[in-house]
């Protein structure tokens, strides 16, 4: 068997396959379907400083080769997570990573400070696609300045591995990635969902209550792959690739394009055991091509 281990900052993953936030609950929900310890890292549901109800229904819609979601970061807040969720997941022997969201820089900072004290959470992933309510609702992640502001503030209080999740809804994602790196990020993950919309022609109304939502699934893969390739060339920190990964071949393509690790999202809804199948598929690919380590294929695309 090939060596599948990779490093993301101070984080060591047994293999490069992770779960994307919002598609795998808190991990425990899937333990009857898959051996959680065979997953490189589990990124749990998005967590905010305070309780959030989420958006009204309908907030999910099927699209050709994908889906739209507008769940709205529904969660019970970080204090609830610490008191009720953390005790249930601290015994899972893999990297448990918390996705952190906020509507103001102070929200991110306070949430990160609280999570920093949890021994069995070795990393956080900042979702900077959230709107900044103090700046007219523009998402932090659509400008280098907005990205720098929140990443620097969190870096000042968070002492473990810091991953920054980038929005694809920008003109030049490399500019945002470089800003994250310069502000102290240990890694960047991309892409978050693409802004999309669905219409019910018979009712002449939007399908989603919020009109627009985040698009994910196989249809977004070419865009995600292109952005991962661009960012991997632009920064010197590990890149985590996601967006439309439905099987092992997709994962290998992302790694050839420069991703050190990958995340699986929408595919978890189709096959709860897809993560382990993908890691096994990567191993088979390495052995067929004579590689002894997965590191040998990172950025090995010949152009």
Swiss-Prot record:
Keywords, sorted A to Z: Cytoplasm, Flavoprotein, FMN, NAD, Oxidoreductase, Pyrimidine biosynthesis
InterPro entries per record: Aldolase_TIM, DHO_dehydrogenase, DHOD_1B, Dihydroorotate_DH_1, Dihydroorotate_DH_1_2, Dihydroorotate_DH_cat, Dihydroorotate_DH_CS, Dihydroorotate_DH_I
Alphabetized Gene3D superfamilies for the sequence: Aldolase class I
One term under GO cellular component: cytoplasm
Compartment list: Cytoplasm
Catalytic activity entry: (S)-dihydroorotate + NAD(+) = orotate + NADH + H(+)
Top EC class of this enzyme: oxidoreductase
Keyword Cell division: no
Listed PROSITE patterns: DHODEHASE_1 (PS00911), DHODEHASE_2 (PS00912)
EC number(s) reported in the record: 1.3.1.14
Quaternary data: Heterotetramer of 2 PyrK and 2 PyrD type B subunits.
Active site: 130 (nucleophile)
Binding site for substrate: 45, 69-73, 127, 192-193
GO biological process, one term: 'de novo' UMP biosynthetic process
Co-factor binding comment: Binds 1 FMN per subunit.
Molecular function as annotated in GO: dihydroorotate dehydrogenase (NAD+) activity
Descriptive protein name: Dihydroorotate dehydrogenase B (NAD(+)), catalytic subunit
Family listed: Belongs to the dihydroorotate dehydrogenase family. Type 1 subfamily.
Known function: Catalyzes the conversion of dihydroorotate to orotate with NAD(+) as electron acceptor.
Gene: pyrD
Pathway annotation from the record: Pyrimidine metabolism; UMP biosynthesis via de novo pathway; orotate from (S)-dihydroorotate (NAD(+) route): step 1/1
């Amino acid at each position: 068997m090939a060596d599948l281990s990779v490093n993301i900052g101070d984080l060591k993953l047994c293999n490069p396959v992770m779960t994307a936030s919002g598609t795998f609950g808190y991990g425990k929900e899937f333990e009857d379907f898959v051996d959680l310890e065979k997953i490189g890292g589990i990124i749990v549901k998005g967590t905010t400083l305070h309780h959030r109800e989420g958006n009204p229904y309908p907030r999910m819609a099927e699209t050709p080769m994908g889906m739209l979601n507008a769940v709205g970061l529904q969660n019970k807040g970080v204090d609830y997570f610490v008191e009720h969720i953390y005790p249930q997941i601290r015994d899972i022997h893999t990297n448990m990573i918390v996705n952190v969201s906020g509507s103001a820089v102070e929200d991110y900072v306070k949430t990160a400070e609280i999570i920093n004290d949890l021994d069995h959470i070795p990393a956080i992933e900042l979702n900077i696609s959230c709107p900044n309510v103090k700046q007219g609702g523009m998402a932090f992640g659509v400008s280098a300045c907005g990205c720098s502001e929140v990443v620097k503030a969190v870096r000042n209080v968070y002492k473990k591995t810091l991953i920054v999740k980038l929005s694809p809804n920008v003109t030049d994602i490399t500019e945002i990635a470089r800003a994250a790196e310069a502000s102290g990020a240990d890694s960047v993950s991309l892409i978050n969902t693409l802004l999309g919309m669905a219409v019910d022609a018979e009712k002449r109304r939007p399908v989603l209550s919020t009109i627009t939502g985040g698009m994910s699934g196989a249809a977004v893969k070419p865009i995600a792959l292109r952005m991962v390739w661009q960012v991997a060339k632009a920064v010197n920190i590990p890149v985590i690739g996601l967006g439309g990964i439905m099987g092992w071949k997709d994962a290998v393509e992302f790694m050839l394009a420069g991703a050190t690790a990958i995340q699986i999202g929408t595919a978890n809804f189709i096959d709860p055991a897809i993560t382990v199948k993908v890691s096994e598929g990567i191993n088979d690919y390495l052995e067929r091509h004579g590689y002894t380590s997965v590191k040998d294929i990172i950025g090995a695309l010949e152009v």
